[in-house]
């Protein structure tokens, strides 16, 4: 089912997320994507805790990140997370911007739905 539900999260780039040039290390962008995705799922009332109670897991099966410009130590970044599809996959789009509204990064993730009792995907 195609949907379009968005949430905006704001974070300050922490010192432990940057390199010696005070630029956020590229792998740490994924951590901010995950924190933003968790906030959106909390907002929807169906977070990972609820999924687990229902017997499901949602592992990331695809991640695509485009880096446009760097984030720096102590920058405030805005992550707009949009859930675009939910059925046999959860598909999210992310836009990371700085306080000036400049695009820093854009990303997409896909999560498969797995039944924990048999570790089978819920594809039809």
Residue ranges of predicted features:
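HotDog/MaoC-like acyl-thioester-processing domains
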Residues: 3, 7-9, 72-76, 83-124
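Hot-dog-fold acyl-thioester-processing enzymes
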Residues: 2-60, 114-124
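Hydrophobic beta-strand-centered segment that forms part of the acyl-chain substrate-binding groove
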Residues: 40-78, 82-91, 104, 112
